[in-house]
Amino acid sequence: MIELKNISKTYYDNGKKVEALKNINLSFNPGEIVGIIGYSGAGKSTLLRCINLLEPPTTGEVIINGVTLNTLNDKELREIRKKIGMIFQHFNLMKSRTISKNISYPLKGSNLSKKEIDLRVEELLELVNLKEKKENYPSQLSGGQKQRVGIARALANKPDIILCDEATSALDPETTIYILKLLKKVN
């Protein structure tokens, strides 16, 4: 379960105070699929980044499965984040790594053997229908293929929670439908 209690996020832009989030209270149950909608600049991405503390809220608490993330040290937070997959709008793939290496990257700090990592990568490549592209580099892929690599990477650690920040916004309608079906299947 995810609970957000009185989450606020304040930025300062050239000395001017900007309240991106103000007293947000939400809760999400396991298995629930929730969409956050709003105008451009409304704070949707900021809210998602506050959930996994990629951006700490200015005030408030983020509680996941009874653990208050705001109180954790860096090491504890890294462990929790292994169970939170994040799919970004702009893929965030490493250009100098093959698709396989991009997908295996989150498993680097795990206790899995090389063989187990390779097997997990193969499973994920099959899931996102990119087995034949495993030795390709991001520059050799279409936007939809890059997004599928991003999804596979987000799923590498078998997360309990998947956060998607406009995961289909730059895709054509056919690829969008494929990605949404894939995310529903994973759920």
Place the predicted regions along the sequence by residue.
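Catalytic Walker B motif of ABC-type/P-loop ATPase nucleotide-binding domains
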Residues: 162-165
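Conserved catalytic motifs of ABC-family nucleotide-binding domains
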Residues: 158
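Short coil-to-helix segment of the ABC ATPase nucleotide-binding domain corresponding to the Q-loop/switch region
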Residues: 97-104
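Conserved ABC ATPase signature
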Residues: 137-141, 145
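Conserved ABC ATPase "signature" region
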Residues: 67-68, 108, 114-132
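Helix N-cap at the start of a conserved alpha-helix in ABC-type nucleotide-binding domains
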Residues: 173-175
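Conserved ABC transporter NBD signature motif
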Residues: 60-68
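Helix-to-loop junction immediately C-terminal to a conserved catalytic motif
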Residues: 52
